[in-house]
Amino acid sequence: MKPVSCVGLLVLLVGVLVTVKGSILFQSPKVLIVSLIRNKEHTLPYFFSYLEDQEYPKDRISLWFRSDHNEDRSIDIIKAWLKRVTKKYHSVDFGYRSDAAKRYDEKSSTHWSEDRFADVIRLKQEALDKGRKMWADFVLFLDADVLLTNPNTIAKLVSLNLPIVAPMLLSDGLYSNFWCGMTADYYYHRTDEYKEILNYEKTGEFPVPMVHSAVMVNINVQQSLNLSFDKRRLPPGHYTGPVDDIIIFAMSANYSSIPMYISNSASYGYILVPLEQGDPLEKDLEQLTNTKVYIINEHGAINLKEDLKHFVPKVPKDKMGVSHIYMINLERRPERRNKMFNNFDELGLDVEFFPAVDGRQLSDDKLRDIGVKFLPGYADPYHKRPMTMGEIGCFLSHYYIWEKMVAMNQEEVLVLEDDIRFEPYFKRRVAQVLDDARRIGGWDLIYFGRKRLQEDDEKWVVGSETLVVAGYSYWTLGYLISLQGAKKLLEEKPLEKLVPVDEYIPIMFNNHPNESWVNHFKNRNLVAWSAAPLLLYPTHYTGDDGYISDTEDSARIDNFNKVLNDTSDSSAEKKGDKEQLSSKTLMDSTISRDEHELSVANRKSEL
């Protein structure tokens, strides 16, 4: 090859793409993507949709897939996707076997037998060797239940140019695709640093003893020749651990002085927690639902290619056993409405859109026509200001639902706002709460999501492990209300002494700190409980990117005179702020899920 002259310099280049006006552009490094696939019909349509949308030149990507021992349509989905995209990629190597559902020594499809480990080790080693022979620059080992929602993931990992690096992936718990500690006998060791990295308390690329499930290997590193999944290739006498591909690979890196890194300098995507032996497939389906709900919360919708949609069954919808479900949403907020209905589609919720009363459309005359009068002396506890038009519209929206459920004689109604995030296993946990509530009886309202405003521990409802007696709370993110509860809230004629709805409800269950307000309401006999842990949280808090409040940030009223410029103290706490409770209280009120300390054998999702 002749030297290339560039601005008076002689440079010998390999892989030059083009020279334009003295500048030289290089082709992107070659990447081999390796995936071992078994019984992933439920994840593959999403796995492929997000993989296809990676913004990295496809003619610089080769695909290497293997699949066997399936009990579902995994092979059909792989074939369908490859039929459409193969020509886009540099090369495709797909091998599969249509053999028995289980190996002879497997007890179930989630059992990691000796033969299964041997097959995975053999195939991964074959793929690594293939990458070397084809002169790939990088090999990306990618599990089929990893959803790379960040389209720049591959480009980012390549640009880091590290020997071994994994993008940190999130799950519906504390599980991720890296370890921060490993014991002398090769087991997971919990460390404080793990949560610091997982929770983005520190960001960057950090050396760790173990990465798995999505691992980029730089083949250009000289020492990478020593990397192996096969313990027979390790230095004699060094390794005495289990026959496990990810452990062996990590130790081969260790023996070769090749550091492994986890990267959390970007948000990359999600991973499902591997099933343990004996776990039913339904558990994985629930995990996938949780993950899709997370993705919708972050991105608004799920990426699913048109030709893969027929592989995804529609989720049947129901009302979870209650009379009706309403979702309050301003008609001028279609993006929130669409996001919520995307959630409902994934969760299987039959929900009616209830158009919210828009504070922007309210006027002094309209309020007089409705019969609205304000509680004498009311001022927001933090801003010391009257109600905003948005808060009035919010109250009226809830009020009209209470009226409607009484008119239609609806026994139990779930009321949802449009800025909520569903907790994992939402429907299953709602069923548990409903079972307890109906068995115990006597309730009027049950918070599913709220902001607690008292430090004192709330007492458990006698006979329940899912319900507490509600203390003073903000927010009406979501609550279950009985017909009797709706009647109680209406009979007090709240429009004649209006306060925000999330002040009115605590007043009515007689747990409000402002006695001067409370004394205006006589029948404070609402029985209010709360789900514990909570089932709903806000999508955003004050100060978060994307935080919008249609109640706090609207015009306020002052004896029916609009004040268009709210000059209240911006440093005061807003209702959109997170709870500021003691750490003990927070621990008691949230799901505590440690890292899934699964056996090494079950930290798997490949063949």
Curated annotation (Swiss-Prot):
Gene Ontology, cellular component aspect: endoplasmic reticulum lumen
Start-end of Basic and acidic residues biased regions: 571-581, 591-607
Region span, Disordered: 566-607
Superkingdom, natural source: Eukaryota
Motif Prevents secretion from ER positions after renumbering to this chain: 604-607
Residues in the signal sequence: 1-22
Residues modified by glycosylation: N226, N254, N514, N565
Disulfide-bonded cysteines: none
Pfam families for this protein: Anp1 (PF03452), Glyco_transf_25 (PF01755)
UniProt subcellular location: Endoplasmic reticulum lumen
EC number annotated for this UniProt entry: 2.-.-.-
Broad class of the protein's primary localization: endoplasmic reticulum
Record has Signal as a keyword: yes
GO molecular function: procollagen galactosyltransferase activity
SUPFAM superfamilies: Nucleotide-diphospho-sugar transferases
Keyword Lipid metabolism assigned: no
Keywords: Endoplasmic reticulum, Glycoprotein, Glycosyltransferase, Signal, Transferase
Family statement drawn from the similarity comment of this UniProt entry: Belongs to the glycosyltransferase 25 family.
Protein name as it appears in the record: Glycosyltransferase 25 family member
Taxonomic source organism: Aedes aegypti (Yellowfever mosquito)
